[in-house]
Amino acid sequence: MKAQPKASHFIGGAFVEDKAGKPLPVIYPATGEEIASLYSATPGIIEAAYAAALKAQGEWAALKPVERGRILRRTAEILREKNRKLSKLETLDTGKALQETLVADAASAADALEFFGGIISGFNGEFVELGGSFAYTRREALGICVGIGAWNYPIQIAAWKSAPALAMGNAFIFKPSENTPLSALALAEAYKEAGLPDGLFNVVQGYGDVGAALVNHRLTAKVSLTGSVPTGRRIMAQAGEQLKHVTMELGGKSPLIVFDDADLESAIGGAMLGNFYSTGQVCSNGTRVFVHKNIRERFIERLVERTRKIRIGDPFDEATQMGPLISAAQRDKVLSYIKKGKAEGATLACGGGVPKLQGFDKGFFIEPTVFADVTDTMTIAREEIFGPVMSVLEFSDEDEVIARANDSEFGLAAGVFTADLSRGHHVIGQIKAGTCWINAYNLTSVEVPFGGYKQSGIGRENGIAALAHYSQIKTVYVEMGKVDSPY
């Protein structure tokens, strides 16, 4: 099974190769086999990307917003036309079940392109009357923006970052995760087919040193990262030295609160979506599931029943509901957290091991795992695991669970399940998290902002807010009379 692209990088509207770069093997997580071989960007590749972006950006920014938007919307159409092909590529790249990639990856990328392509013509400055004279503001492009992606949603992240940047008139250079470098190249081809001028969307591959080179480049106006908190801190420090704009979408250890009046099956479904989708590799996952003591036993019993029915196996079988983790290293990390959970006294309700799957013995699979009797101080309740491991904690009253939910360095997301919408709104109003749900979980519509509080990030993806983060404001004062000067 192979997925070798035409070349490692996409610069100035064309595939580009430089075999002097460090080899970058692409591994299919379900089997452990190498499906492609790429090369990390050399300094020459990086400079070529900036030269192409610089050449194209000014003319692009001068276009009418509606003209820029038209190209983005055409790109969305192309992604939808090729959704099945792109979904298969994403499954090869990530190991995620095709059942999932068909609806959640290229499809979400298309949604973002369609949204920003449509709304950009209405994203304007403001007019301020000043008693005869007046002022107005202009929203202007930043210049060349850099995106650094994660390996859980490669094409979605590439589009979520590039769509608002391009809509605002910026040029974009994207570095995918070294684990999942393929689908960003497919997005670049879609942009090209849609008529995006050469040089506006460039893809450079590489490891952390390439990301650092992009962050520190003198022509970089903004950096948008999806990644871990430690990586975010390093990039913030580097960008801060040159006062570059940043958006940081980082990790989480989000609370999901289930009150005793909640619809039990819906709450369990939400908890499973918030822990097992993408094999648990979702930054906003609600991995701390707080369940009211009155329904705790019923909740866990039914949760375990449903979790044991999750179908694990061949990601290309559309009946498969869960694929492997991204790598052997990630699987070993998750298994180490499961070991810690048991050692610290949590009850392993189900899962916790490596399934035996015929034909996939070298894949990076792990069973969906549920821990009960978890306390707030346990490692599995404090640290982001990034795998299919759910911690169920018991609570007895509203004020208590709000305080415990907020007792975290993270603040990316939160959810509440209750039949009392008044209580739902009240609780969410007290939770320190940037993206919240009531009677749902992990639904991320591109029309609304996505991002976190505290250590979970700075800035927002999606919604009109994202356009603000890819632009700068110019204020213009217009004097309608004579200048009144004491000199």
From Swiss-Prot:
GO BP field: glycine betaine biosynthetic process from choline
| PROSITE patterns the record matches | ALDEHYDE_DEHYDR_CYS, ALDEHYDE_DEHYDR_GLU
Reaction(s) catalysed (UniProt annotation): betaine aldehyde + NAD(+) + H2O = glycine betaine + NADH + 2 H(+)
Q: Record-annotated residues binding K(+) 2?
A: L243, K454, G457
**Record keywords, A-Z:** Metal-binding, NAD, NADP, Oxidation, Oxidoreductase, Potassium
Annotated positions of the Cysteine sulfenic acid (-SOH) modification: C283
Q: Which residues fall in a coiled-coil region? A: none
How would you classify this enzyme at the top EC level?
A: oxidoreductase
Q: What does this protein do?
A: Involved in the biosynthesis of the osmoprotectant glycine betaine. Catalyzes the irreversible oxidation of betaine aldehyde to the corresponding acid.
**Protein name, per record:** Betaine aldehyde dehydrogenase
Look up and give the organism this protein is from: Brucella melitensis biotype 2 (strain ATCC 23457)
**What is the primary gene name for this protein?**
betB
